[in-house]
Swiss-Prot record:
Domain of life: Eukaryota
Main location: cytoplasm
Alphabetical list of PANTHER family matching this protein: TUBULIN
Keywords noted in UniProt: Cytoplasm, Cytoskeleton, GTP-binding, Magnesium, Metal-binding, Microtubule, Nucleotide-binding
Cofactor(s) needed for function: Mg(2+)
GO CC terms in record: cytoplasm; microtubule
Amino acids binding GTP: Q11, E69, S138, G142, T143, G144, N204, N226
GO molecular-function terms, A-Z: GTP binding; GTPase activity; metal ion binding; structural constituent of cytoskeleton
Primary role: Tubulin is the major constituent of microtubules, a cylinder consisting of laterally associated linear protofilaments composed of alpha- and beta-tubulin heterodimers. Microtubules grow by the addition of GTP-tubulin dimers to the microtubule end, where a stabilizing cap forms. Below the cap, tubulin dimers are in GDP-bound state, owing to GTPase activity of alpha-tubulin.
Subunit structure: Dimer of alpha and beta chains. A typical microtubule is a hollow water-filled tube with an outer diameter of 25 nm and an inner diameter of 15 nM. Alpha-beta heterodimers associate head-to-tail to form protofilaments running lengthwise along the microtubule wall with the beta-tubulin subunit facing the microtubule plus end conferring a structural polarity. Microtubules usually have 13 protofilaments but different protofilament numbers can be found in some organisms and specialized cells.
GO biological process, one term: microtubule-based process
Pfam (any one): Tubulin
Organism phylogeny: Eukaryota, Viridiplantae, Streptophyta, Embryophyta, Tracheophyta
Name this protein carries in UniProt: Tubulin beta-1 chain
Length: 447
């Protein structure tokens, strides 16, 4: 079976990850002790993708949990599904990374990384045919960003032909936890551009807006935000876990979404948006789902797709529905909004249909888009980075851990290159004259 190994790192990653497992367990009918109590044989058909079946009939998540301090792990362990994980798969240090990327990547994290890799190896050997890894982390702190990217590069070295998918929470423009977020995020993006295959970009501010505007929650908690993220994660991976009429795996997803290797940062969205605890009474139709899913307000990162163009997009519908209707709706969206899609990639929207809806819903859909407007996120982080780096503010925390200023400069220019690549393809046209291409060749020579 095509297994996926899940890794969560740092406080944010562990909290999102714990929520994700609650959702996936519920969908597969697995209770908090790992026993199956579901009523549908489809729940078990591909349960091996995320679970290992132990000899006693219990299902154990293929998950590795890591952090540089024990706090978050303890709360995962004492949480609703804390007892389902393999105890050996909790790997943690005592010192913490103090929101410092260098501590996570070079000093504290580097000391712990081997024990994490041992667990990863053990889990990978347990797989029949591992298709890839998914990593949950944030880019603003120290552990998820620094140690997370260190682990990704080590895994890349050891398993070069396996897919690497990340769910990365970017620092938000208005909601900031720490002042050095732009440093940590830029250094992380520098790594993710090179070592990850697909990055789902999330961001707390966009999630706050969804909770506030759409779900009408006056004071959204992290629990509410994580509820949205886990719904999306479950949607992104549903066609890997359940049989469906049009299925995909991590590699097919990448092939359909990534026209150029560096441009692998995706926006995600989910429909119908429901808050925790509320159930929807009215079943949505496929056209309504499609409309809500493409809505800019539904995107879980602070970039507006209307400011750019879609290179590619992929939609995953869940529930009993006709594939014909899904295809018609998707074509309809493309025809109505043709200016928002690049014309030099024909048929750039793919859809998959999976028969099993999420718990409590009749139908749902998840959206993954590769839009050039994601450059807004990178631009914003880059501006904040430059403002501080120009004055060398807070730099001693990083150089004190053995980092060099050169690394900051490289990360900054890599991020700026990424932004200009997105811009270049946003402006590109499908002219037949060939003039376009000559220009691009010149650009290539200069670089």
């Amino acid at each position: 079976m095509r297994e996926i190994l899940h890794i969560q790192g740092g406080q944010c990653g562990n909290q999102i990850g714990a929520k994700f497992w609650e959702v996936v367990c519920a969908e597969h009918g697995i209770d908090s002790t790992g026993r199956y109590g579901g009523d549908n044989e489809l729940q078990l058909e591909r349960v091996n993708v995320y679970y290992n079946e132990a000899s006693c009939g219990r299902f154990v998540p293929r998950a590795v949990l890591m952090d540089l301090e024990p706090g978050t792990m303890d709360s995962v362990r004492s949480g609703p599904y804390g007892q389902i994980f393999r105890p050996d798969n909790f790997v943690f240090g005592q010192s913490g990374a103090g929101n410092n990327w260098a501590k996570g990547h070079y000093t504290e994290g580097a000391e712990l990384i081997d024990s994490v890799l041992d667990v990863v190896r053990k889990e990978a050997e347990n797989c029949d045919c591992l298709q890839g890894f998914q990593v949950c982390h944030s880019l603003g702190g120290g552990t998820g960003s620094g140690m997370g990217t260190l682990l990704i590069s080590k895994i890349r070295e050891e398993y070069p032909d396996r897919m690497m998918l990340t769910f990365s929470v970017f620092p938000s423009p208005k909601v900031s936890d720490t002042v050095v977020e732009p440093y940590n995020a830029t250094l992380s993006v520098h790594q993710l551009v090179e070592n990850a295959d697909e990055c789902m970009v999330l961001d707390n501010e966009a999630l706050y807006d969804i909770c506030f505007r759409t779900l009408k929650l006056t004071t959204p908690s992290f629990g509410d935000l994580n509820h949205l993220i886990s719904a999306t994660m479950s949607g992104v991976t549903c066609c890997l876990r359940f049989p469906g009429q049009l299925n995909s795996d991590l590699r097919k997803l990448a092939v359909n979404l990534i026209p150029f290797p560096r441009l692998h940062f995706f926006m995600v969205g989910f429909a119908p948006l429901t808050s925790r605890g509320s159930q929807q009474y009215r079943a949505l139709t496929v056209p309504e789902l499609t409309q809500q899913m493409w809505d800019a307000k539904n995107m879980m990162c602070a970039a507006d797709p209307r400011h750019g163009r879609y290179l590619t997009a992929s939609a995953m519908f869940r529930g009993k529905m006709s594939t014909k209707e899904v295809d018609e709706q998707m074509i309809n969206v493309q025809n109505k909004n043709s200016s928002y899609f690049v014309e030099w990639i024909p048929n750039n929207v793919k859809s998959t249909v999976c028969d099993i809806p999420p718990t409590g819903l009749k139908m749902a859909s998840t959206f993954i888009g590769n839009s050039t407007s994601i450059q807004e996120m990178f631009r914003r982080v880059s501006e904040q980075f430059t403002a501080m780096f120009r004055r060398k503010a807070f730099l001693h925390w990083y150089t004190g851990e053995g980092m060099d200023e050169m690394e900051f400069t490289e990360a900054e220019s890599n991020m700026n290159d990424l932004v200009s690549e997105y811009q270049q393809y946003q402006d590109a046209t499908a002219d037949e004259d060939g003039y376009e291409y000559e220009d691009e060749e010149e650009i290539g020579e200069e670089a």
